[in-house]
Amino acid sequence: MEITFVNPGADYMIQRMIENDLLAEINYDHIPNLKYIGDNYMKMTRQFDPENKYSVPYLWGTVGILYNTKLLDELGVPAPTKWADLWDERLSGEILMQDSVRDAFMVALKKDGFSANSTDETELQQAKQDLIDQKPLIQAYVIDQVRDKMIGGEAALGVIYSGEAIFTQRENPDLEYVIPKEGTNVWIDSWVIPKNAPNKENAEKFIDFMCRGDVALKNFEYITYSTPNDAARDLIEDEDLKNSKIAFPDLSQYSGLETYTYLGEDGDSLYNDMWKEVKSN
């Protein structure tokens, strides 16, 4: 099968692909609609694509806590403001955690005041123990299911991506989203082109098409994940959505925000081994 372009998802995967010489440099002369991508998002991508040679921002967002105000009121528990609130024993059986090694460890590392990209074994051991200690409180480790469970009122709170939070609020008005005060992961998904792509110029044409303001708007309205396209945001007619603090938070108002970076093979192995200990404990 011939692959012309890919959206590898996680920003740190792009860094890994760059380091392994798997990506083609993009000819930005073929992508005039790149001008609609906000400068701040191009700066964000430099954390994994330092010279902006290999990627074009597609979607972005944060990881935070989605909570059901009605259920929390019934439990007599205040709205969460920090990651440490996910260790509140009053919430036993009401917490949904992401079934993802990087996201789960990010929560614990941030709770403890450490970097989401830490490879310090002492810090990771502390985070691992925190996750083990949290397990009796967890209803389930989930990925996509967090959306449906929260919409259905099956849990009081869960760790979720901001784009999913926007969708859930459309379905259940009792749901609110917060970026914890300790900081979080700010992620950005980007388009890249494999080095051996047989139709690189067509791939660039497609990326340029996806950077058109009207196209980016339709994409955002359909999938509810935030667009880095300034022209698309200007075209949003729903004022509540256009000014949504979930979709378009003012990142300057938060501290401790980080994109994930590639940890190297040793770092990946360390995280994966510790995650297995958490899940099997």
Predicted regions and their residues:
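A bilobed periplasmic-binding-protein/Venus flytrap-type ligand-binding module shared by bacterial periplasmic
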Residues: 66-71, 110-111, 187-199, 210, ...
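A ligand-binding cleft/hinge motif common to bilobed small-molecule-binding domains
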Residues: 12-16, 151, 157-174
